[in-house]
Amino acid sequence: MSAVLRWGRRHGLRVVAVVVFALLALGLAPESWRAAGAATLPRLSPLLNLFGALAAREWVGWTILLGVPLLVVSFFWGRVFCWRLCPMGFLAELAGKLNPWGRGWVQRVPALNEVFALFIVVTAAFGYPLFLWLDPLCIFNGFFVAWRTPLTVASASIGTMFVVVMVLAALVPNMWCHKLCPLGGLQQAVMEFARWLRRPRGARVRNEEGPQVLTAASTSRRSFLGNVGIAIGTSITLGGAGLALKGTKRGAQALRPPSADVERINALCARCGNCMKACPYELIHPDLGETGFDGFLSPVIHFRSKIPNWDPDEDRYCFQDCVKCTQVCPTGALRPITVEQKHAMPIGRAEVLKDKCLAWAKGEYCAVCDEYCPYKAVKLEKRNGVNCPVIDPDKCRGCGACEGACPGDPVAIIVRPLSSVV
């Protein structure tokens, strides 16, 4: 019993933190502040919050300040968040206890966490931050998104990085926290910078009768400045390559959530899954290869034609008064918008497949798409004595109401990305 009490005193706060963060990630907070709770967890990370805003070049709201306390704490107390509150760190530590024989391996691996963190900071200045998806709070949040209902291969894929980290922690204990985690690396860099500012005079002393004597403070400074140099040099190269790639369209286009665009999603999306969890109609899914490598696991919208077991009697589309997905993005990949702004912001355009349409192909009366369209974007034109649907491109917003309601099997009207509509 005494051993249990000692473990509880030592790790009680960490257990509470894991439970609280898991409840936030699962969206089990009270309804009145569920959206705010969903966005809070990833926004506690300055890598996602502050440097995401830097890359976006815009103010994303007062929630940006949620990332400041961790930097302040790191400046004065170092990596205290890692050892006391980080849910990924605690779970990785527990996984590492399964393999006490693997602890020696971690000493042979160079520490890359500071380099990863500085990559993110420097490349954010280029507007194309790298390794955002390695943020531990993002990984933790994404894992719990996988448990939304219904569970599918697509929804589960967003949590794969969590499994990878846990397996790595079990095989090589301490590898993730000590060598790879960029949030830990950022705290380490801030701590070393603070030591550099507080360095005592004469910390670096030259012995007249021999070589220079380096104290621990000067060694820490040398390590810090060396990592900064490596990160800046590599980031300039990779960031420049990212800027060049931003103007290159690769792979097919896909439907994106409101306020999104291809370049912004590819540059800023951390794959945290918040937008997928926030969508009340379960229309947002991780990209499993539709848009190429750079869009992998970023959010795409799927309507009836891409969702199996769709119930055509279910009122399920991108509702004109819903902007929840844009309110929970921690990096600014999805700009926060109002309902009024959404009305002027099409995400795609419907296209009638005339060879499958009951009216066009068979001359049968059917005006379901016209009846269900909330934007009145479907016009009926008389052809051979039958009213046939035609899309008004100036009114269509690509909400998917027509696609979901179409009685055809296969569906005779689908929403396409704007860039692919002829």
Give the ranges of each region predicted by the language model.
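Non-ligating segments of multi-cofactor redox enzymes
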Residues: 1-422
